[in-house]
Curated annotation (Swiss-Prot):
The active site is at C107, C204. It catalyses: S-sulfanyl-L-cysteinyl-[protein] + uridine(34) in tRNA + AH2 + ATP = 2-thiouridine(34) in tRNA + L-cysteinyl-[protein] + A + AMP + diphosphate + H(+). Keywords: ATP-binding, Cytoplasm, Disulfide bond, Nucleotide-binding, RNA-binding, Transferase, tRNA processing, tRNA-binding. This is tRNA-specific 2-thiouridylase MnmA. It holds the Pfam family tRNA_Me_trans. It comes from Lacticaseibacillus paracasei (strain ATCC 334 / BCRC 17002 / CCUG 31169 / CIP 107868 / KCTC 3260 / NRRL B-441). Disulfide bonds join C107-C204. ATP binds at G16, M17, S18, G19, G20, V21, D22, S23, M42, G131. It is an enzyme of class 2 (transferase). The lineage of its organism: Bacteria, Bacillati, Bacillota, Bacilli, Lactobacillales.
Length: 377
C-alpha cells in the first residue's frame, strides 16, 4: 500500500498563542504536521490584576518557552486600541443599555479573526490557528462548514458564530477533534511548559477579576428600587448593570413564612431604574416562548429558509432547544421555541445548529411569552 505524505512545509500557519495549553498544543501539532509555523502573542489589554501582577508578562514568557520547545519563531503584537474600539466600547454600551453583552463573540469576530488575521497576512500567512475547540469541513463547492468540537464540554462554536466564510477559509482548528484531557496528555508527553497550566476564565482577554468593581471603574452605578412584578418594594439594587436575568446571588432577599423559595432577577426597567425580582427558579416572568434577534450572521454565507426548524443555544454550554426561524424585512428575526426557555437575556448570543453544524447566530434583543414582551430591559 502506498502512503502519501503531504508536504506542508510551504504552507505558513500563524498561531495565536495565549500562553495556555490549548494554543500551545495547536502550535505543536501543526509543527508535527510539517507546516511552517509562526507563533504570535496578542496583548489586548493593560492587564495588571488585582494583586498588581501583569498577567500578560507571565503569559508571554510561557509563549516564549513553548515556542522554544517546539522550535518555532514567535512575535508579540499589541491590539489594545483595536480591542478598546471594537470590543470594549461595545461591552460598555451594552451595559449602559441594561443588556448583558457577550464580549467573547465580538472578540473572536473583531480581534482574533480580524485584526489578528490582518496582521498574519503581513507575515504571509496561508492560515491562522488558535486553541479553539471547533472543527471545519469543506464541501465540494468550496464552502466551509463549522462543526462542534468533539469535546462537548469544551465546544466553542457558540463563541465563533459570528465568523464569516472569508474568516473560516483562512482558519485551522487542530485540536477540534480532541478531548481536553487528550490535549493535556499531548502537552505533557512533549514536555511543554504549559502542560499543567490552568485554563483561563472570565471576560475575553480581561480575565478573572472582581467584575462589579471592574465595571464600576468605567460606568457610574445608579442604585434604585428592587420590586416584585406586582409592585411590592423589596429593597434597593446597586445598579442595573450589575444584574443579569435569572441571577440569584447578591440580591440580599430571603424567603418568607409563606414562601421559602429563593429570589431571582426577573426583569429590568431601564427608564425607571427598577430591578424586578420574583420567587422560584421557574418563575413565570422568567419563562419565554420566543425571542427577537438582530445582527444575524450565517457562517456559510447562506441564510436558512424561512420557517426552518433547527436547534439553538441561548447561553454557552446550554442544552440545545428546538426552534423555528421567521425573518422580518428589517433584517431581524423571530425565533419560536419548541418548549418554554428560562432566562432569555437581551445582549447575549443566540446560536443556531443543524445537528453538529453551527449555522451562525445573532444578538438577542427581546424575549416574549406568547407574543407579550417580557420586561427585560
Amino acid at each position: 500500500m502506498m502512503v502519501i505524505v503531504l508536504d506542508n512545509s510551504n504552507i505558513r500557519v500563524v498561531v495565536g498563542m495565549s500562553g495556555g495549553v490549548d494554543s500551545s498544543v495547536t502550535a505543536l501539532l501543526l509543527k508535527q504536521q510539517g507546516y511552517d509555523v509562526v507563533g504570535v502573542f496578542m496583548k489586548n489589554w493593560d492587564d495588571t490584576d488585582e494583586n498588581g501582577v501583569c498577567t500578560a508578562t507571565t503569559d508571554y514568557e510561557d509563549v516564549a518557552k513553548v515556542a522554544s520547545e517546539i522550535g518555532i519563531p514567535y512575535y508579540s503584537i499589541n491590539f489594545e486600541k483595536e480591542y478598546w474600539d471594537r470590543v470594549f466600547q461595545y461591552f460598555l454600551d451594552e451595559y449602559k443599555a441594561g443588556r448583558t453583552p457577550n464580549p467573547d463573540v465580538m472578540c473572536n469576530k473583531e480581534i482574533k479573526f480580524k485584526a489578528f488575521l490582518d496582521y498574519a497576512d503581513q507575515l504571509n500567512a496561508d492560515y491562522i490557528a488558535m486553541g479553539h475547540y471547533a472543527q471545519v469541513k469543506t464541501d465540494e463547492n468550496g464552502i466551509v462548514h463549522m462543526l462542534r468540537g468533539a469535546d462537548g464540554n469544551k465546544d466553542q462554536t457558540y463563541f465563533l458564530s459570528q465568523l464569516s466564510q472569508d474568516q473560516l477559509k483562512k482558519s485551522l482548528f487542530p485540536i477540534g477533534h480532541l478531548q481536553k484531557p487528550e490535549v493535556r496528555k499531548i502537552a505533557e508527553a512533549a514536555g511543554l511548559a504549559t502542560a499543567k497550566k490552568k485554563d483561563s476564565t472570565g471576560i475575553c482577554f480581561i480575565g478573572e477579576r472582581n467584575f462589579k468593581q471592574f465595571l464600576s471603574t468605567y460606568l457610574p452605578a445608579q442604585p434604585g428600587k428592587m420590586m416584585t412584578v406586582d409592585g411590592v418594594e423589596m429593597g434597593t439594587h446597586d445598579g442595573l448593570m450589575y444584574y443579569t436575568i435569572g441571577q440569584r446571588q447578591g440580591l440580599g432577599i430571603g424567603g418568607n413564612s409563606d414562601n421559602s423559595e429563593p429570589w431571582f432577577v426577573v426583569g429590568k426597567d431601564l427608564d425607571k431604574n427598577i430591578l424586578y425580582v420574583g420567587q422560584g427558579f421557574d418563575n413565570p416572568a422568567l419563562m419565554a416562548t420566543s425571542l427577537s434577534a438582530s445582527n444575524l450572521n450565517w457562517t456559510t454565507g447562506q441564510a436558512p429558509a424561512e420557517g426552518t426548524h433547527m436547534t439553538a443555544k441561548f447561553r454557552y454550554r446550554q442544552r440545545d432547544t428546538g426552534v423555528t426561524l421567521h425573518y422580518h424585512d428589517d433584517g431581524t428575526a423571530t425565533v419560536d421555541f419548541d418548549v418554554p426557555v428560562r432566562a432569555i437575556t437581551p445582549g447575549q448570543a443566540v446560536v443556531f445548529y443543524d445537528g453538529d453544524e453551527c449555522l451562525g447566530g445573532g444578538t438577542i434583543d427581546a424575549a416574549y411569552a406568547h407574543t407579550n414582551e417580557l420586561q427585560y430591559v
